[in-house]
A protein has these predicted regions:
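Transmembrane beta-barrel strands of outer-membrane/channel proteins
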Residues: 9-15, 37, 45-49, 80-84, ...
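Repeated loop/turn-to-beta-strand initiation elements of outer-membrane beta-barrel proteins
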Residues: 41-46, 74-80, 111-117, 144-149, ...
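Hydrophobic, lipid-facing positions within transmembrane beta-strands of outer-membrane proteins
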Residues: 7, 29-33, 63-67, 100-104, ...
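Short glycine/proline- and aromatic-enriched beta-strand/turn motifs that initiate or cap beta-hairpins
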Residues: 1-44, 48-52
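Outer-membrane beta-barrel transmembrane domain signature
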Residues: 122-246, 250, 256-264
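A broadly used, surface-exposed interaction patch
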Residues: 65-66, 72-74, 78-81, 87-90
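Solvent-exposed loop/turn segments connecting transmembrane beta-strands
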Residues: 20-29, 44, 51-62, 86-98, ...
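Eukaryote-skewed repeat-based solenoidal scaffolds used as protein-protein interaction platforms
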Residues: 83-85, 93-116, 121-141, 146-148
Length: 264
């Protein structure tokens, strides 16, 4: 069937901001509206904002601009994208010191399951670039005349931890930037993660995306179980500590609308 260009309107709720199996000690629930244009050639652009819904800190916490190219054939799929991040100065998100990323993904359908490989680099103005790699295994199961899709998914992620060191320096609870600590130089003194540049397995994650399509609407719900790996050794002026990583359950739910097209 001939491809067509389309616009997607999306509204999603995320129960917490989790990245590489890490999150802040204070949850960051987001309401995320987005608008994307997908050209039939494969090029796309997307804009979204993340509104922090906690009553005591409600604000627009993040604005994202993404552009890239995607390829889809019967067996092979690929994605190349770049994203620019604009975080609120008060954000305590685990990613809040990241300013941009470049990501490439290549997937192949083996019939029994689909395997995807991902490589990405994340940039920050205050530290070196992080490099990550990931492997994903998933299997789509269809029902209700293919309108219902359930996709059991397993991911392994690995990489460096400069982003985590920056988070501990500026945003960890008790060490916040923003309104109360905006010009306080003491909040970023001598915090370091041992072997921050070393490539380690950071997260094992299981998820179960569930999608239901009705005409041009798509309803989705995805539970995630993250099992973080490679506990960081953190050095401060006062002490050296080994962090105690805990497994994380989080979820998202949303509704999307396709304009002038139907999702295949």
């Amino acid at each position: 069937k001939e491809k067509s260009s389309y616009v997607v309107f999306d509204l999603k709720y995320e129960s917490d901001a989790v990245f590489m199996g890490r999150n802040d000690s204070v949850s960051a629930p987001y309401l995320v509206p987005s608008l994307g244009f997908y050209d039939k050639s494969g090029f796309f652009a997307d804009a979204s904002l993340s509104y922090l819904t906690k009553s005591e800190e409600s604000r627009i916490d993040l604005f994202l601009l993404t552009a890239g190219y995607q390829l889809n054939s019967k067996k092979l799929s690929g994605l190349l994208s770049g994203t620019k991040y604009f975080f609120s100065k008060d954000s305590y998100s685990i990613q809040s010191e990241i300013e941009g990323d470049l990501t490439a993904t290549l997937g192949y359908d083996l019939s029994l399951f689909k395997i995807s490989l991902t490589a990405s680099s994340y940039f920050s103005s205050n530290s070196s670039t992080d490099f990550f790699a990931g492997i994903q295994l998933d299997k789509s199961i269809y029902a209700l005349d293919d309108n219902l899709e359930i996709t059991p998914t397993f991911n392994i992620y690995g990489g460096s931890q400069y982003f985590y060191q920056e988070y501990y320096t500026y945003n960890r609870l008790g060490n916040r930037k923003g309104k109360n600590n905006a010009e306080n130089p003491s909040i970023n003194n001598s915090i370091a993660i041992k072997k921050v540049n070393q490539f380690n397995v950071l997260n094992l994650e299981i998820s179960l995306p569930i999608q239901f399509q009705s005409n041009s609407f798509l309803f989705s719900f995805t539970p995630h179980w993250a099992f973080p790996q490679s506990n960081a050794t953190i050095t401060t002026n006062e002490t050296i500590l080994k962090e105690d990583l805990k497994n994380i359950f989080y979820w998202s739910a949303g509704i999307s609308y396709w304009l002038n097209t139907k999702k295949k």
